[in-house]
From Swiss-Prot:
<comment type="function">
    <text>E3 ubiquitin-protein ligase which accepts ubiquitin from an E2 ubiquitin-conjugating enzyme in the form of a thioester and then directly transfers the ubiquitin to targeted substrates. Catalyzes monoubiquitination of 26S proteasome subunit PSMC2/RPT1.</text>
</comment>
<dbReference type="Pfam" id="PF13639">
    <property type="entry name" value="zf-RING_2"/>
</dbReference>
<comment type="similarity">
    <text>Belongs to the RNF181 family.</text>
</comment>
<comment type="pathway">
    <text>Protein modification; protein ubiquitination.</text>
</comment>
<dbReference type="InterPro" id="IPR001841">
    <property type="entry name" value="Znf_RING"/>
</dbReference>
<dbReference type="InterPro" id="IPR013083">
    <property type="entry name" value="Znf_RING/FYVE/PHD"/>
</dbReference>
<dbReference type="GO" id="GO:0005737">
    <property type="term" value="C:cytoplasm"/>
</dbReference>
<keyword id="KW-0479">Metal-binding</keyword>
<dbReference type="GO" id="GO:0061630">
    <property type="term" value="F:ubiquitin protein ligase activity"/>
</dbReference>
<dbReference type="GO" id="GO:0008270">
    <property type="term" value="F:zinc ion binding"/>
</dbReference>
<keyword id="KW-0808">Transferase</keyword>
<keyword id="KW-0862">Zinc</keyword>
<keyword id="KW-0863">Zinc-finger</keyword>
<dbReference type="GO" id="GO:0016567">
    <property type="term" value="P:protein ubiquitination"/>
</dbReference>
<protein>
    <recommendedName>
        <fullName>E3 ubiquitin-protein ligase RNF181</fullName>
        <ecNumber>2.3.2.27</ecNumber>
    </recommendedName>
</protein>
<feature type="zinc finger region" description="RING-type; atypical">
    <location>
        <begin position="79"/>
        <end position="120"/>
    </location>
</feature>
<keyword id="KW-0833">Ubl conjugation pathway</keyword>
Length: 156
């Protein structure tokens, strides 16, 4: 039995493209119905709906290379990506969060996303829009925290 995509001679859309298509459809529906449009909901650079960009190339290249010590090798420390034990005197990459990875495991990961596979600590990116989004998100979080503190101080 042929798949839906084969029968209709089309390809599945990626999540980013699907988000854009949905936003455009919603815009068209609103225009057809003569409704007020909230322009904020049609921001096509909405990073809450998209995958983060790759880590900055300069940051990835500057990740420290660490040599596995005999103690670490004896403990059976493993690469969290491939699950192979590190060997004594093996060169591995250390993330800012201190997690260790084989170079061949972590570099492809960081070419797709900007975070540690274990703890999700984010590295800087080369995408100015995403960096601005992160700053704005942090400002909103701080503002909410200050508001909670103020509210708590009023009622204690």
């Amino acid at each position: 039995m042929a798949s839906y995509f084969d029968e209709h001679d089309c390809e599945p859309t990626n999540p980013e493209e699907q988000y854009r298509q949905n936003a455009l459809l919603e815009l068209a529906r609103s225009l057809m119905q003569g409704l007020d449009i909230d322009s904020g909901s049609f921001d096509l650079s909405d990073w809450d709906q998209r995958l983060p960009p790759p880590a900055a190339k300069a940051v990835v290249q500057s990740l420290p290379v660490v040599i596995i010590s005999p103690e670490q090798a004896d403990k059976g420390v493993k690469c969290p990506v491939c699950l192979l034990e590190f060997e004594e005197q093996e060169s591995v990459r250390e993330m800012p969060c201190k997690h260790l990875f084989h170079t061949g495991c972590i570099l492809p990961w960081l070419n797709k996303t900007n975070s540690c596979p274990l703890c999700r600590l984010e590295l800087p990116t080369d995408n100015a829009d995403y960096e601005e989004f992160k700053k704005d998100k942090e400002r909103r979080r701080q503002r909410e925290h200050r508001l909670e503190d103020l509210h708590g101080a009023m009622y204690t």
